[in-house]
């Protein structure tokens, strides 16, 4: 197992050997034979004893070892005997040698593990009944399996003061066994050197040295990798036991990455959200917003239909009354008098149902909140608005040019991939835009969009770096396209991507042009033919406007005529609901089986974990019921039929967990030459500059008290939200 050089891992200066991230297969002639309890196994040179054992299905106990972290070798729980060797060895750190016979269950191995476990438990408080890790604790499981049935420790146990590292992670450091997983995660994966050890021997402690908030958008992952109960979730504390909850596999919609998650529920309530393994998207990590914003699902919810009365106040009503009012308006208008805006958390089923509904009244004014330039290729070519290299593809790149984006807070798991490749490979990163605090070193080329013109013409110094690259990537943030010169920026990036693709001589399957989206619904909406941006609605104000989860504030009441009838359909009383004449309560992503498409064009499904609150219903069902009352019944009654319709409109939307290869980059580049737009003098400034801007970006996270505490802790310090411990 390759160790990351200490200097590089801790302060990010040196480079570790190539090939750590994605290794190629080894020729059979180079394999060596070893034996695990007498069973032969062929492994690559450099394979550790632990990896060789796992290859034959033999699980070796461990605390400090983690597959995605560097090897520490400090817990000693993985000690095994090597036949004819004088001493037991640490399986996680010892490379195998040809002909070794590894004895995993010999008396010597058992005695060594028992001794290690005895030392680990010597200072452990043994407070399992009040520990949130109970039931899913490695220390519990391994002490039961490999430990002794009695203790010889009679002395007093040490006690360690708990650290306040913010409103998300609860620390009970007396339980800590100094495995250093959290420290290695912080420095290697998160790229934040906030955690470390102080003292030595019995006085060693893990903490931040100077008490401060753990400033990372990935901080919650240290809860998952902690093998004991030293680091647990503050919002989840004392709420449920793991065996009491029902687990539902789903996906996250807090950003456009589409991280795979597990939703744990009990009695119809979301108790917590955990990561689910997906090697091509989020590996086994999730962002803090994904993990902790679930309390926003319980607050500010729309649970019953509402209508605005004669006094201008919103009052509760029945579904029949609300739908009848909207149906009456729908029957009164047609064509451009009817329009719709889709928000950032809307699923593909609702998008296609709304599209079909408006098409029934001869309207095609269907817009998204996010802008995407229509000039040039616009959204006609799918490759023009996708992360074509894919998220995992970053690990193969040797140069990445970031334009107008801060991936650390717009797409934390994509940023973690960039850091992973930068740390283990010779990845060079450059940024055009406002300087931001990324978790890797980068060359800041400036913040003017005119730099793109210089690079495209070959007059910029960085042009040489791009042309010399073997697998270059250009990543354009969708936030840069919200500007008035968005078309010029997109055209310049398209031109750069095409030129360096030719210069690099990369294989045809390597894609250079990439768009990094910020919201979960955008790609599906563009696939279904929605118009990006609301300019069409501003120019031709409708008489009837549907806001489908539109809470981005892209349009206000002042932008519309006084007689415009607004229908809001969504799950939170956020920005869109207060301006509506009728409110139709919808279901959140944990309450429906729905399709979302991430920034790389991968379709995935959420699953029903809990039922919608009150009288709320799934969005496509509401639209289907409305169509029937309006006398323009949509031709589907079940979810499967809606998905069949999805497949008719855009087949890639029902090819789940598959990234359809996008092409026509040369055509897009040629069309980009037709764009006649000047660059603005304004600098490229991403909307999420600091971690404070990361926590509250949509209707769910804005309703979350936990996310509000995070913002307060960042601005005022962790002590501002300190809560008294109850254990």
UniProtKB/Swiss-Prot annotation:
It comes from the Eukaryota. Binds 1 [2Fe-2S] cluster per subunit. Binds 2 [4Fe-4S] clusters per subunit. It is a peripheral membrane protein. Keywords: 2Fe-2S, 4Fe-4S, Acetylation, Electron transport, Iron, Iron-sulfur, Membrane, Metal-binding, Mitochondrion, Mitochondrion inner membrane, NAD, Oxidoreductase, Respiratory chain, Transit peptide, Translocase, Transport, Ubiquinone. One of its GO terms (molecular function) is metal ion binding. GO terms for biological process: cellular respiration; mitochondrial electron transport, NADH to ubiquinone; mitochondrial respiratory chain complex I assembly. It catalyses: a ubiquinone + NADH + 5 H(+)(in) = a ubiquinol + NAD(+) + 4 H(+)(out). GO terms for cellular component: mitochondrial inner membrane; mitochondrial intermembrane space; mitochondrion; respiratory chain complex I. It is found in: Mitochondrion inner membrane. Its EC number is 7.1.1.2. The keyword Cytoplasm does not apply. Residues 1-23 form a transit peptide. InterPro entries: 2Fe-2S_ferredoxin-like_sf, 2Fe-2S_ferredoxin-type, Mopterin_OxRdtase, Mopterin_OxRdtase_4Fe-4S_dom, NADH_UbQ_OxRdtase_75kDa_su_CS, NADH_UbQ_OxRdtase_ferredoxin, NADH_UbQ_OxRdtase_Gsu, NADH_UbQ_OxRdtase_Gsu_4Fe4S-bd. Residues 30-108 form the 2Fe-2S ferredoxin-type domain. SUPFAM superfamilies: 2Fe-2S ferredoxin-like, 4Fe-4S ferredoxins, Formate dehydrogenase/DMSO reductase, domains 1-3. [4Fe-4S] cluster 2 binds at residues 176, 179, 182, 226. Belongs to the complex I 75 kDa subunit family. PANTHER family: NADH-UBIQUINONE OXIDOREDUCTASE 75 KDA SUBUNIT, MITOCHONDRIAL, RESPIRATORY NITRATE REDUCTASE. This is NADH-ubiquinone oxidoreductase 75 kDa subunit, mitochondrial. It comes from Rattus norvegicus (Rat). The lineage of its organism: Eukaryota, Metazoa, Chordata, Craniata, Vertebrata.
């Amino acid at each position: 197992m390759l160790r990351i050089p200490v200097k590089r891992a801790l302060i990010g200066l040196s480079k570790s050997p190539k090939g750590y991230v994605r290794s190629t297969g080894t020729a059979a002639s180079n394999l060596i034979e070893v034996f695990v309890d007498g069973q032969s196994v062929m492994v690559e040179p450099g394979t550790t004893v632990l990896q060789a054992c796992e290859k034959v299905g033999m699980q070796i106990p461990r605390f400090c070892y983690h597959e995605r972290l560097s090897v520490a070798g400090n817990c000693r729980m993985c000690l095994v005997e090597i036949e004819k060797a004088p001493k037991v060895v640490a399986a996680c750190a010892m490379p195998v040698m040809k002909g070794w016979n590894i004895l995993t269950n010999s008396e010597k191995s058992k005695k060594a593990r028992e001794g290690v476990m005895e030392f680990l438990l010597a200072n452990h408080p043994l407070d399992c009944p009040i520990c949130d890790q109970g039931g899913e604790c490695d220390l519990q499981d391994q002490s039961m399996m490999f430990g002794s049935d009695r203790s010889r420790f009679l002395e007093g146990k040490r006690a360690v003061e708990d650290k306040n590292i913010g409103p998300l992670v609860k620390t009970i450091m007396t339980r800590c066994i100094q495995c250093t997983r959290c420290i290695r995660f912080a420095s290697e994966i998160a790229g934040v050197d906030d955690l470390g050890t102080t003292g030595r021997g019995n006085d060693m402690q893990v903490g931040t040295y100077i008490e401060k908030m753990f400033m990372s958008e990935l901080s919650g992952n240290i809860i998952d990798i902690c093998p004991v109960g030293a680091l647990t979730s503050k919002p989840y504390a004392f709420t449920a036991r793991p065996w009491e909850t029902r687990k539902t596999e789903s996906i996250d919609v807090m950003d456009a990455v589409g991280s795979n998650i597990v939703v744990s529920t009990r009695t119809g309530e979301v108790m917590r959200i955990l990561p689910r393994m997906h090697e091509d998207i989020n590996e086994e990590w999730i962002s803090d917003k994904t993990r902790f914003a679930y309390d926003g699902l319980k607050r500010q919810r729309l649970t019953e239909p509402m209508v605005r009365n004669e006094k201008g106040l919103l009052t509760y009503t029945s579904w029949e009354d609300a739908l009848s009012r909207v149906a009456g308006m729908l029957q009164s208008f047609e064509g451009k008098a009817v329009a719709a805006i889709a928000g950032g958390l809307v699923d593909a089923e609702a998008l296609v149902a709304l599209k079909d509904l408006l098409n029934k009244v001869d309207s095609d004014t269907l817009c998204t909140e996010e802008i995407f330039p229509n000039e040039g290729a616009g959204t006609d070519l799918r490759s023009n608005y996708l992360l074509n290299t894919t998220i995992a593809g970053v690990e193969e790149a040797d140069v990445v040019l970031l334009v107008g984006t801060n991936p650390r807070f717009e797409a934390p798991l994509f940023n973690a991939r960039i850091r992973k490749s930068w740390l283990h490979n010779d990845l060079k990163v450059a940024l055009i835009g406002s300087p931001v605090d990324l978790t890797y070193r980068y060359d800041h080329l400036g913040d003017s969009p005119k730099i793109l013109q210089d690079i495209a013409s070959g007059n910029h110094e960085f042009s040489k770096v791009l042309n010399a690259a073997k697998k270059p990537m250009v990543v354009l943030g969708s936030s840069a396209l919200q500007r008035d010169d968005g078309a010029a920026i997109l055209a310049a990036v398209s031109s750069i991507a095409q030129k360096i693709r030719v210069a690099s001589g990369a294989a045809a399957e390597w894609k250079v042009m990439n768009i990094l989206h910020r919201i979960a619904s955008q790609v599906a909406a563009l696939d279904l033919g929605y118009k990006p941006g609301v300019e069409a609605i501003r120019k031709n104000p409708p008489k009837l406007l549907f806001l489908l989860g539109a809470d981005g504030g892209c349009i206000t009441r002042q932008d519309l005529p006084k007689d415009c009838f607004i229908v809001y359909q969504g799950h939170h009383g956020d920005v869109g609901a207060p301006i509506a004449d009728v409110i139709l309560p919808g279901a959140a992503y944990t309450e429906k089986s729905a399709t979302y498409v991430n920034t790389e064009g991968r379709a995935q499904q959420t699953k029903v974990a809990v039922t919608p609150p009150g009288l709320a219903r799934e969005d496509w069902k509401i639209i289907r019921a409305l169509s029937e009352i309006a006398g323009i019944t949509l031709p589907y009654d079940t979810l499967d039929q809606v998905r069949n319709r999805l497949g008719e409109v855009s087949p890639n939307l029902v090819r789940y967990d598959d990234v359809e290869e996008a092409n026509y980059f040369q055509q897009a580049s040629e069309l980009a030459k037709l764009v006649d737009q000047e660059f603005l003098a304004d600098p490229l400034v991403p909307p999420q500059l600091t971690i404070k801007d990361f926590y509250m970006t949509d209707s769910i996270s804005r309703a979350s008290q936990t996310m509000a505490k995070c913002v307060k802790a960042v601005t005022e310090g962790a002590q501002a939200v300190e809560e008294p411990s109850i254990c």
